[in-house]
């Protein structure tokens, strides 16, 4: 039984080999049965154990000789299975492989060798061990193995083993290299005939296959039209973007080409001969060669060119004749037809060869004379068709036909007629023969002309058809003659009048008759049109050049003369400079600018003739621009480039600029180049719209304002009104925009002019003191604006100029410069005048720290000027009493009238002041309001208000400021001093924008309340301060103490002291409002600068109130008047600047000066400073420091000296007189309705000054905290501009100023001012609105 098993096994062994391919199916069930799976390593161990098993079996098999070997494997398998099963591995495939490769060999040794890494180099397939991983079967799948695949894997595993053998390594390396070589050959190996096929394709059309619609390909310029046929490029080709082409004679290249072809082809002859070729084909080729041999010999003699092959390809494109190319196409077409008809491949080959041979011969026949055309036609054929070896030619023809099968000749022929690359390349020599022939061979449908064309246009198109037929055989080069261009241009001009659709149809129709495609035709037509336009430009250009050349000699002569004069002047200057250097003169700096001047300018002087010629030229050029299809440039850029490149060179170098040409010809091209966006739109100043509100203000304040300076209140008021020079009538609505005069800011008026204007104003005020009272109330609305203007003027005024003025003038200048502290004149008159000026200026400067000088309304400036002039007149002509009263009246009228009047009354007319005090109390002086506004410290009390109260108008003003001030300053300041310093109170808020509010509020209250005493207003906010002054004109009693100018002065100092000690208790100081007022002013400035709101601001408030009172210590500071009172004030003021408070708040300085100017300017300034010091701890110094502390020192020139303080003080005083002044408005946030009119200042505040505005003058309370730094340097400029603005604003009159204060501002301005004014009105509300 063993035998059969053996046999079965033997017979199955091969099957096993096959089965091994599907071991999974046979033994998969068994494999799954074995639960565990062993990984390769575990399996390797059993495999290693297997070898002993065979060894054991081997001896057993030895007992059985023949069948032993075969059963051995069985036993091996069986024995091997148990271990594998034990190890749960599938080694069954392994046993079959060993028997298969070497069934009859001894398995043990091979297995040992395998396990031992096969030390012997015997056959690699002796034994194979496979590691199989079994997985549990599932219902859907079971493990499957493919024996052949496993065997291959095993062989791969063995390869590294064999690599150990050096011999095997060599063999393997050789095999690897061979494989790599084959791989690269397959990948990169080239086909030898590929190049020739490309050349054959190039023969037909080098450009074939390119996308003609690709914008990158430019076929608009044909090389053959530009380069003669006798020339070719030096190296036989085109190199894009590599420079200029270099040419040489084409005959050489042609001969070289033929010789090259021959030279290259003889070596091929033997190779071809080796091949078997039919005799007929050979004979045909030989015949063709014989015909061409003579030519070949000649080139050989000449020599062979290395670049021949390349040149031949390029020449094909350049020198192809239309006839030869058409013949070639005909030939290829016939060949293609023959190939289609004949199914036998040989027949087409024969036909093709014969046809291929014929064209060369035909070409030769055509060119027996060896003309260029023949050479070019034959030359391209030579490399393919002409050869000494027929067989080679046959192969070439065969390849060519294969390639031609890929060509759509119908499409090529159509393209030829359409001006396709074929036609373009074929007709590059200028031939139209090709398109004509193509149309004959393959008739093409010509697009019909659109209907409805003009008769003339159709006629010209017909002319073009006829001309095209005449030129058909001459090529494109000769096609576009002058006549043809004229026809085309005429057609183009007529087409320009038609629509784009019709134009396109006509172009499509014309395309069939011209040797170019539609796109090229359109480009050519446009180019012709532009050329004609350029021709039209030549004549006008020539005329212009002629005209310029005629005019230039004279201008050049003048220029040379100027140069000579300049040189002479330079020489003279040089000599003088040397002398000055020797003398050590200081004028060298002045001469330096002259030295920098290079020379006279080359400025061309236009005349009408040249301008007309230029315009004509530009008109023609604009016509060209309109013809541009794609306007890549704007008309402006187009013209400018034309002028730069074409027109400008007509002038000598340096004599003309393109921008001048553009400007001179603007009349012609303005419709195209005047885009609104390019124009610089300079917004016009806003119209003055505030007349109504000023009028209302005027009405209310008119009654309440008591003429301070006038003998009687009514007289003062009237005087003020008249002094205002019809300020009430003149009360134009002052727009914030208009209020700031740009020119004034940039060109500040001279101090002298300002002082003169102020003097005039003062003189005017003298007459109508009583009337001024009413005028001032009327001007209430304007006080803000006027004050702003005054502040502007103050900023422009030089700091020290007031000192230079006479005592009277000094008083005025001081008042103008009130913002800058300065000594106040001692004389009551001087004090009064000074007070007026200072009141006007100081109030406004203090009030509007943020307001630029420019913002002040022109009317305010005028009023300021009038007041200053009046003040001058009064101070110079009147005694202390009369001049003071007049000045006060004038000041009152301008600054609300009351302020100035108060200043004067304390000095000379204490009784008058008392009389007016009732009115003034009701009336809030703009200056006072301004000061309060500038004062950021709400603590400042209304002590100054009592001072104002000294003069009835002033007292009223003080009251209002007090009221406003009280709200603003009530929280910060003590209530005690508020009563007396209602103005100061207000000033304190004014630091927080209370000044503006005060001024406005006072003005508005005066106007609205019928001049309820400012104290009454102040009383409501801060009744405790000075209820009487605020509520009623009773503060007049305070002025009464100053009934006599001297007592008034003394009272003023006392009042100032009181203010310093207490702002509130100064209701009585109100009795000497002048002195209190100056103190208030000083305090106010200092308060703006410092944090002490109560004491300093009270005095600041007073000043602001007393701004109407022109008695401003600032005057003393400014002019340093000799008057004892003024001197006292200046000294204190000086202290203030020295402390640096002046620098921080010129307002403080101003405030002091203003009080001094008023009743008893000197005393008041002293008191003022005392008040300030009381607030700060030391007179003026204290006041100044507080100002600097609380705010960015409202005055930029805080560091400026007493002189600066004096100036600012004078300015403040003047501003105070001009109630409209609202310089401090910006800081103010109007809290009270009354203050709202003063809010105008706020509106002004936004205005920026061209120059640094000394903040000390403006007294920017809260807002200007950081401004202090600029005070010193800017004070002079500020005074200047401020004076100018002040004069402007004040000229209209106090009434106008008052009206300005109340005048409603533009909405945005009003809002700003309202915010500022409210803050001013309520000391507690420091610029809350803002």
Curated annotation (Swiss-Prot):
Residue spans of biased composition, Low complexity class: 701-730, 864-895, 1017-1029, 1045-1054, 1061-1079
Biased composition range(s): Pro residues: 93-111, 1030-1044
Keyword Transmembrane: no
Record's compositionally biased regions (Polar residues): 345-356, 807-816, 896-913, 938-956, 1082-1148, 1158-1169, 1308-1317
A biological-process GO annotation: chromatin organization
Modified residues annotated as Phosphoserine in this record: 13, 251, 312, 417, 420, 423, 585, 1107
Linked residues for Glycyl lysine isopeptide (Lys-Gly) (interchain with G-Cter in SUMO2): 273
Basic and acidic residues composition-biased segments: 16-37, 67-79, 123-133, 575-585, 688-699, 1321-1330
Keywords: Acetylation, Isopeptide bond, Phosphoprotein, Ubl conjugation
Record-listed Phosphothreonine modification sites: 244, 253
GO cellular-component term (any): nucleus
Residue(s) carrying N6-acetyllysine: 1052, 1132
Region (Disordered): 1-133, 249-304, 336-356, 574-597, 672-730, 802-833, 864-913, 938-988, 1017-1201, 1308-1330
Listed InterPro entries: HRD, UBN_middle_dom
Pfam family, one: HUN
UniProt record similarity statement: Belongs to the ubinuclein family.
Name of this protein: Ubinuclein-2
Organism (species): Bos taurus (Bovine)
Lineage: Eukaryota, Metazoa, Chordata, Craniata, Vertebrata
Gene responsible for this protein: UBN2
């Amino acid at each position: 039984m063993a035998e059969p098993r053996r046999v079965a096994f033997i017979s199955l062994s091969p099957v096993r080999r096959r089965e091994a391919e599907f071991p999974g199916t046979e033994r998969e069930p068994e494999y799954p049965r074995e639960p565990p799976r062993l990984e390769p390593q575990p399996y390797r161990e059993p495999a290693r154990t297997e070898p002993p098993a065979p060894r054991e079996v081997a001896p057993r098999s030895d007992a059985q000789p023949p069948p032993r070997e075969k059963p051995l494997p069985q036993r091996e398998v069986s024995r091997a299975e148990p271990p594998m099963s034990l190890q749960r591995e599938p080694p069954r495939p392994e046993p079959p492989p060993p028997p298969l490769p070497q069934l009859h060999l001894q398995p043990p040794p091979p297995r040992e060798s395998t396990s031992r890494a096969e030390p012997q180099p015997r056959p690699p397939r002796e034994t194979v061990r496979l590691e199989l991983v079994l997985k549990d079967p599932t219902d859907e799948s079971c493990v499957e193995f493919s024996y052949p695949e496993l065997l291959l894997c095993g062989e791969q595993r063995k390869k590294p083993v064999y690599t150990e053998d050096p011999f095997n390594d060599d063999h393997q390396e050789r095999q690897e290299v061979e494989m790599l070589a084959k791989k690269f050959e397959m990948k990169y190996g080239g086909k030898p005939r590929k190049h020739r096929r490309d050349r054959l394709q190039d023969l037909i059309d080098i450009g074939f296959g390119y996308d003609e619609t690709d914008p990158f390909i430019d076929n608009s310029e044909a090389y053959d039209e530009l380069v003669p046929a006798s020339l070719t490029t030096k190296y036989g080709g085109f190199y894009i973007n590599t420079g200029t082409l270099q040419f040489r004679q084409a005959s050489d290249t042609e001969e070289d080409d033929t010789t090259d072809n021959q030279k290259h082809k003889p070596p091929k002859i033997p190779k071809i001969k080796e091949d078997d070729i039919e005799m007929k084909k050979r004979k045909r080729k030989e015949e063709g060669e014989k015909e061409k041999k003579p030519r070949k010999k000649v080139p050989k003699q000449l020599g062979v060119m290395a670049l021949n092959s390349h040149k031949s390809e390029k020449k094909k494109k350049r020198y192809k004749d239309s006839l030869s190319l058409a013949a070639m196409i005909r030939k290829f077409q016939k060949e293609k037809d023959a190939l289609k008809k004949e199914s036998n491949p040989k027949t087409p080959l024969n036909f093709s060869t014969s046809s291929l041979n014929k064209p060369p011969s035909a070409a030769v026949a055509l060119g027996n004379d060896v003309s260029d055309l023949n050479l070019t036609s034959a030359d391209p054929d030579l490399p393919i068709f002409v050869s000494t070896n027929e067989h080679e030619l046959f192969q070439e023809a065969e390849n060519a036909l294969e390639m031609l099968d890929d060509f759509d000749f119908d499409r090529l022929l159509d393209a030829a007629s359409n001006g396709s690359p074929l036609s373009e390349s074929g007709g590059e020599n200028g031939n139209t023969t090709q398109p004509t022939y193509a149309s004959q061979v393959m008739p093409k449908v010509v697009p019909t002309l659109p209907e409805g064309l003009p008769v003339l246009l159709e006629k010209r198109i017909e002319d073009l058809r006829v001309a095209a037929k005449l030129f058909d055989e001459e090529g494109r080069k000769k096609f576009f003659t002058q006549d043809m261009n004229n026809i085309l241009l005429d057609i183009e001009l007529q087409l320009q009048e038609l629509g784009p659709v019709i134009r396109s149809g006509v172009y499509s129709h014309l395309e069939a008759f011209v040797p170019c495609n539609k796109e090229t035709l359109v480009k050519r037509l446009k180019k012709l049109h532009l050329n004609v336009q350029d021709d039209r430009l030549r004549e006008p250009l020539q005329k212009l050049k002629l005209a310029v050349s005629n005019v230039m000699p004279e201008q050049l002569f003048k220029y040379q003369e100027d140069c000579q004069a300049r040189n002479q002047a330079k020489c003279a200057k040089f000599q003088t400079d040397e002398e000055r250097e020797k003398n050590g003169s200081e004028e060298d700096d002045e001469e330096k600018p002259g030295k920098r001047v290079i020379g006279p300018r080359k400025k061309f002087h236009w005349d009408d003739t040249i301008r007309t010629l230029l315009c004509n030229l530009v008109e023609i050029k604009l016509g060209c621009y309109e013809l541009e299809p794609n306007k890549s440039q704007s008309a402006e850029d187009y013209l400018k480039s034309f002028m730069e490149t074409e027109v400008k060179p007509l002038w000598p170098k340096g004599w003309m600029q393109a921008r001048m040409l553009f400007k001179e010809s603007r009349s012609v091209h303005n419709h195209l180049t005047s885009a609104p966006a390019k124009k610089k739109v300079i917004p016009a100043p806003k119209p003055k719209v505030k007349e109504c509100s000023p009028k209302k203000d005027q009405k209310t304040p008119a009654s309440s304002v008591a003429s301070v300076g006038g003998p009687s209140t009514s007289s003062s008021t009237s005087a003020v009104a008249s002094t205002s020079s019809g300020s009430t009538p003149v009360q134009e609505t002052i727009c914030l925009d208009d209020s700031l005069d740009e020119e004034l800011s940039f060109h500040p008026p001279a101090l002298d002019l300002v002082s003169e204007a102020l003097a005039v104003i003062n003189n005017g005020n003298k007459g109508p003191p009583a009337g001024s009272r009413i005028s001032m109330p009327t001007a209430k609305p304007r006080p803000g604006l006027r004050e702003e203007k005054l502040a502007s003027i103050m900023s422009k005024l030089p700091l020290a100029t007031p000192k230079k003025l006479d005592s009277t003038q000094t008083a005025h200048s001081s008042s103008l410069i009130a913002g800058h502290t300065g000594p106040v004149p001692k004389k009551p008159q001087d004090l009064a005048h000074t007070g007026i000026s200072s009141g006007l200026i100081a109030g406004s400067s203090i009030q509007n720290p943020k307001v630029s000088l420019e913002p002040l309304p022109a009317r305010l400036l005028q009023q300021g000027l009038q007041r200053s002039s009046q003040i001058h007149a009064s101070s110079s002509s009147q005694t202390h009493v009369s001049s003071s009263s007049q000045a006060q009246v004038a000041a009152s009228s301008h600054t609300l009238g009351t302020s100035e009047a108060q200043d004067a009354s304390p000095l000379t007319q204490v009784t008058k002041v008392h009389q007016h005090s009732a009115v003034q109390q009701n009336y809030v002086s703009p200056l006072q309001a301004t000061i309060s506004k500038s004062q950021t410290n709400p603590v400042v009390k209304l002590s100054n208000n009592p001072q104002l109260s000294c003069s009835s108008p002033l007292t009223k003003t003080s009251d209002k400021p007090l009221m406003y001030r009280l709200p603003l300053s009530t929280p910060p300041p003590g209530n005690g001093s508020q009563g007396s310093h209602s103005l100061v109170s207000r000033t304190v808020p004014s630091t927080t924008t209370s000044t503006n509010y005060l001024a406005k509020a006072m003005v508005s209250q005066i106007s609205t309340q019928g001049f309820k005493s400012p104290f009454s207003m102040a009383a409501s906010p801060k009744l405790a301060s000075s209820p009487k002054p605020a509520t009623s004109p009773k503060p007049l009693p305070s002025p009464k103490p100053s009934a006599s100018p001297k007592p008034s002065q003394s009272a003023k100092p006392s009042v100032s002291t009181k203010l310093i000690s207490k702002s509130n208790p100064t209701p009585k100081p109100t009795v000497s409002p002048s002195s209190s007022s100056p103190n208030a002013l000083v305090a106010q400035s200092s308060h703006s600068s410092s944090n002490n709101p109560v004491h300093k601001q009270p005095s600041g408030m007073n000043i602001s109130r007393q701004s109407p009172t022109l008695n401003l210590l600032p005057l003393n500071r400014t002019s340093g008047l000799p008057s004892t009172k003024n001197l006292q004030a200046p000294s204190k003021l000086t202290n203030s600047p020295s402390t640096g408070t002046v620098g921080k708040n010129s307002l403080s300085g101003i405030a002091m000066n203003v009080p001094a100017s008023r009743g008893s300017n000197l005393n008041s300034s002293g008191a003022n400073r005392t008040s300030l010091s009381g607030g700060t701890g030391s007179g003026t110094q204290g006041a100044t420091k507080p100002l600097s502390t609380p705010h960015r020192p409202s005055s930029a020139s805080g560091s400026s000296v007493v002189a600066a303080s004096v100036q600012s003080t004078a300015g403040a005083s003047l501003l105070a007189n001009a109630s409209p002044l609202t310089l401090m408005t910006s800081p103010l946030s109007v809290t009270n309705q009354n203050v709202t009119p003063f809010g105008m200042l706020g509106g002004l505040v936004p205005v920026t000054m061209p120059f640094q505005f000394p903040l000390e003058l403006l007294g920017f309370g809260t807002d200007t905290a950081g401004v202090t730094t600029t005070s010193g340097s800017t004070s002079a400029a500020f005074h200047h501009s401020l004076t100018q603005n002040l004069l402007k604003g004040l000229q209209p009159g106090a009434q106008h100023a008052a009206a300005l204060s109340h005048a409603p501002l533009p909405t945005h301005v009003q809002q700003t001012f309202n915010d500022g004014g409210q803050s001013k009105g309520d000391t507690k509300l420091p610029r809350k609105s803002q």
